[in-house]
Curated annotation (Swiss-Prot):
PANTHER family: HETEROGENEOUS NUCLEAR RIBONUCLEOPROTEIN D-LIKE, RNA-BINDING (RRM/RBD/RNP MOTIFS) FAMILY PROTEIN. Residues 30-112, 115-194 form the RRM domain. CDD domains: RRM1_hnRPDL, RRM2_hnRPDL. PROSITE patterns: RRM. The keyword Ribonucleoprotein does not apply. Residues 212-224 have a biased composition (Gly residues). This is Heterogeneous nuclear ribonucleoprotein D-like. GO terms for biological process: regulation of gene expression. Keywords: Cytoplasm, DNA-binding, Methylation, Nucleus, Repeat, RNA-binding, Transcription, Transcription regulation. SMART domains: RRM.
């Protein structure tokens, strides 16, 4: 219990989810997925409970981006892999009156470390030179993509940065928000095409099974009128995406006995609450480097 007390005092010293996020595509034996959480369980509650099994270096509970309400699941990163084994040895875990379901989080096999990031909330007035200067400070940039609205020929409120290696991405993800130019931007890992396709399929499956029919797909429906928005919504939460897209677990295959409609899991992340990234008020009229077909090239990027 002394260990738990020590952790509860220092639990807020690290940026929530930053260390978990930075290694999401890499195998980390100290990382766990925690399902079945009570909506009332806080990050502090979860950290204090799990600290009895070992030192917790990062912990995050995923929330609805619009309501801020817990989705009932999260991730934890232990300092030592032995702590994960201790958690798994105990057959039953109860927290805040609910049985929780801790599982080992495993990165997808054969997945390369991320070298590309999504930058949301970018002011369309931010010049390409400003973008190069800021992101170049983290490492060597291979490519910058500045998506355009093909109807208005104006810059969108987001961009993509590709580095020559993964180290700059790790550094960037240590902080969720970055001040770039006049705007506060959110940095996420850009999902590869195969993950995007998986998410599309899972979205369709989730909508057909979820209660309320089409009502659950409101965010995606808005995007159908704008291809960029449809692709953007499917970035989900870049730190985690859909659990099965960013991580795999042999015993889950869709997180087993849990009802996705309750978590609204397939629609997690960039939905209606993030349409302010559209840049509709932008006046920056720089032409797209890829011409009229550039939009198709960067979807889902």
């Amino acid at each position: 219990m002394e260990d738990a007390t020590e952790m509860s005092g220092g639990a807020e010293e690290f940026a929530e989810g930053s260390k978990i996020n930075a290694s999401k595509n890499q195998q980390d034996d100290g990382k766990m997925f925690i399902g079945g959480l009570s909506w009332d369980t806080s990050k502090k509650d979860l950290t204090e409970y799990l600290s009895r099994f070992g030192e917790v270096v990062d912990c995050t509970i995923k929330t609805d981006p619009v309501t801020g309400r817990s989705r009932g699941f999260g991730f934890v990163l232990f300092k030592d892999a032995a702590s994960v084994e201790k958690v798994l040895e105990l057959k039953e875990h109860k927290l805040d009156g609910k049985l929780i379901d801790p599982k080992r989080a495993k990165a997808l096999k054969g997945k390369e470390p991320p070298k590309k990031v999504f930058v949301g909330g970018l002011s369309p007035d931010t010049s390409e030179e400003q973008i190069k200067e800021y992101f170049g400070a983290f490492g060597e940039i291979e490519n910058i993509e500045l998506p355009m609205d093909t109807k208005t020929n104006e810059r969108r409120g987001f961009c993509f940065i590709t580095y020559t290696d993964e180290e700059p991405v790790k550094k960037l993800l240590e902080s969720r928000y970055h001040q770039i130019g006049s705007g506060k931007c959110e940095i996420k890992v850009a999902q590869p095409k195969e993950v995007y396709r998986q998410q599309q399929q899972q979205q369709k499956g989730g909508k057909s099974n979820a209660s309320g029919g089409r009502g659950g797909g409101r965010g995606r429906g808005r995007g159908q009128g704008q291809n960029w928005n449809q692709g953007f919504n499917n970035y989900y939460d870049q730190g985690y995406g859909n659990y099965n897209s960013a991580y795999s677990d042999q015993s889950y295959s869709g997180y087993g006995g849990y009802d996705y409609s309750g978590y609204n899991y397939p629609n997690y992340g960039y939905g209606p609450g993030y349409t302010d990234y559209s840049g509709q008020q932008s006046t920056y009229g720089k032409a797209s480097r890829g011409g009229g077909n550039h939009q198709n090239n960067y979807q889902p990027y």
